Amino acid sequence: MLIVLPPSETKTHGGSGKPLDFHHLSFPSLTKARQTILADLQALEVDEALKVLGISEKLRPEAESNRALETSPTMPAIFRYSGVLYDALDAATLPEKALERLAIGSALFGVIHATDPIPHYRLSGGTKLPTKSGELPTMKARWGTSISEALIDVNQLVIDLRSGTYQQLGRVKDAVTVRVESVMEDGSRKVVSHFNKHYKGELARVLALSEKEAHNAEDVMSIAQAAGLVVEENPNHKETLTLVV
């Protein structure tokens, strides 16, 4: 199984790895698109980047880091991204076998494996990044069907924990997806938004550490339930599971 996580806007700076080498990234079919997007992102002057990326002057260092994408140090992607989901995942305590089951969606790289070395960058899935010819394509248009095709080619069950924006960049037919819901006092259900990432991080950790391999949604549910999580099937869509918290 391959567990695909969403990226995070917050990232760890620095790193001790050599500068970015596209040949050291997984899913080589995405290389050409990666190179084009990176070149367009790196070409943005900082003031223009603030507007394009939709960030404030306070985050100017984020835009400045994009000017050095090919020269700045790298670190494994799983440690580059930070935030609520990654805190719950606690990748630093995962064995190598568990890390091999993890991938991450990315506006810049499409999808990468957890251990792929990447630099610090700022680019979200909803950004319209200008091309050298002045066009403003969406990230979805830039990636086309390439992310979907790359994930289909892994020939494993894909457990897609990406947020909607990143799923739009490359959906995977028959992938298992997960909704997070809480039970209200009156028994009704409410979709969890604020802590959604935390619970998905916990689920990703459980799945990554599992001694069993998942081949379908029922297997995913079984693994999660064995670890004490409350997971339910969706009678109307067998690939969609509900994590109840």
UniProtKB/Swiss-Prot annotation:
Superkingdom of origin: Bacteria
InterPro entries: YaaA
NCBIfam families: PRK02101.2-4
GO cellular component, one term: cytosol
UniProt name for this protein: UPF0246 protein Cgl1995/cg2186
GO biological process: response to hydroperoxide
Disulfide bonds: none
Family, as annotated: Belongs to the UPF0246 family.
Family annotation (PANTHER family): PEROXIDE STRESS RESISTANCE PROTEIN YAAA, PEROXIDE STRESS RESPONSE PROTEIN YAAA
Transmembrane annotation, as ranges: none
